[in-house]
Amino acid sequence: MLTIDDAKPHDLTAAYNAELAAEHVEAVSPWLSAERFSRALGDVHDRGYAVIESVMAKDELDAYRDILNTHMAQSPTGRNVFEGTKSHRLYALLAKSPLFANMIQHPLAMAFAEHFLGPTCLLSACLSINLHPGETVQPWHTDDGHITVPQPHGIFGISVFWALDDTNEANGATEILPYSHRWDSHEIEGRLDNAHFAQRDDLDGSVEENAAAVKATMPAGSVMIMRSDVWHRGGANHTDQDRMIVTPQYCAGWARPLESMLLAVPPEKAASLPQRTQELLGYSIHTPFMGYVDGMHPSRVLQ
């Protein structure tokens, strides 16, 4: 896999707000120097993704895992090929525990999301994905396919993948097609279609290996940042161990989120969350006044 140091530098000055860009450099400094942050931004913009290793400590990972294991024990496995019939997916994570606010508004995630999407970006989805032994690959897909603008197009979303376990070629590391945001979507063989959402067991998500694919291997505690228009898929788990990630996904402030966050997280729970997380849920305004409630700022609902 290419490293951040291989990437071309990217202008750290976000077009929307140079002052905010400087704040990002300071915010990510515990993990990335200004130069490495610049190169990571270049990675995401140009080839579509960047991996930053060993961001979270073991005690943080264990806390998330304990919460998720409790809820997975009470939930069914995936309903179709896309979700994975040998996978557990949990949605609406902020409704399950406020601890996930720390992950959702982590300085690294915010720096990339705000750089590419602007400060009015929203949380589009936040789910955990636990691949059990024997899980097969997903169909190729993008995370912004619901926005029906032909590829190639600009960056409408940023997807973040937090590795709670070591992810490797054997246990289902996410497979990515670098630079595929530049392609015409019709070039992708084995891409997602409506049949993959059917609750049937006669469909197989497996397709032949794509020679252009890269497997995003990384140790536990690492994070991958990816453009939402990059073609990718969950890998197959050929081991006897689970592989778990949590993926918060962000969209531009004008876009409809994949999960209806204002319904997924009840107002009484949202009211106790940090302000930045509330804004990401939709208790915020996209310039000049998109998102108002009865002519007023939506955050008033929580007061």
Residue positions per predicted region:
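A short secondary-structure junction signal
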Residues: 136-143, 150-151, 170-176, 185-189, ...
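Short, conserved beta-strand element in jelly-roll/cupin
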Residues: 116, 150-169, 217-220, 225, ...
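Active-site region of the double-stranded beta-helix
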Residues: 119, 133, 146-154, 163-173, ...
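Conserved double-stranded beta-helix
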Residues: 2-4, 12, 25, 183-225, ...
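Conserved hydrophobic/aromatic beta-strand scaffold that supports enzyme active sites
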Residues: 49-51, 139, 159-163, 176, ...
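Non-heme Fe(II)-dependent double-stranded beta-helix
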Residues: 2-47, 52-151
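Short helix-to-loop capping/linker segments positioned immediately adjacent to catalytic or ligand/cofactor-binding
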Residues: 112, 146-151, 161-165, 211-214, ...
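Short, solvent-exposed loop/turn segments at secondary-structure junctions
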Residues: 57-58, 128-131, 145, 167-169, ...
